[in-house]
UniProtKB/Swiss-Prot annotation:
This is 3-methyl-2-oxobutanoate hydroxymethyltransferase. GO terms for biological process: pantothenate biosynthetic process. GO terms for molecular function: 3-methyl-2-oxobutanoate hydroxymethyltransferase activity; magnesium ion binding. GO terms for cellular component: cytoplasm. The active site is at E180. It comes from the Bacteria. It holds the Pfam family Pantoate_transf. Homodecamer; pentamer of dimers. Its EC number is 2.1.2.11. Belongs to the PanB family.
Amino acid sequence: MRTTIRDIQQMRDRGERIPMVTAYDYTSAQIADRAGIPMILVGDSLGMVVLGHDSTVPVTLDEMIHHTRAVVRGARNALIIGDLPFLTYASPEQAVISAGRMLQEAGAQAVKLEGGVHIAPTIARLVHLGIPVMGHIGFTPQAVNQIGLRVQGRRANEARQLLEDALAVQEAGAFAIVLELVPAELAQAITERLRIPTIGIGAGAGCSGQVQVWHDLLGLYSDFVPRHARRYTDLATVIGEALTQYVHDVRTGTFPGPEHSSRMDPTELAAALGNLEES
């Protein structure tokens, strides 16, 4: 049975930490689902770790829908949240169309939007129409060209703004909020002042849950390793070694072996070849 927003809220209310990961394809979603991950984010981070862009900005809504469909097919139990990419929710009206496509065409159960006070009316509009929304404040990757890649909220005025953002997103009806690259002390203070779960990434252990990018978590992406990421394994090395062995086996003729091939009755083969030669 698929995890619901109510389930996530109850986890928060019980003090149960909430793990979330990103996934971008059917196979990864299957693996995450089997591991018991209750929420999967189809993040626009796919622009970097899957499509090879320098940021999330070039990602399109069609690309997000394509990948979200695959994740929905792969994960039967997790709550699936689809990112709305850059400039697909510039107005409440545009957000309704974009979020509607994410739910209707892709099959996501919720969408995620970046922004605080200024985006709250858009969140409220979506929630009013029955579209569940996860918020995202702090470092917002879609604004990287404007704010740069840095921790947000270290100064008192910035911290106050982030708290106002979090409260505005909550009051607009978001069911959860991502806190990215926020000082741990501030993230905990925000968490304690909200009724909804906070999901941290580079925001310390005081959040209601944590999210990590699939490729960072598993050691698949070497172009850039965020400080806040913990590599639980080094799949890039494991996969590289496997592919090197495959190349060796093909070139030396040790693959495929007899066990990897099907056989044919010699008389049938002779008859077939004989017919070919006669023709």
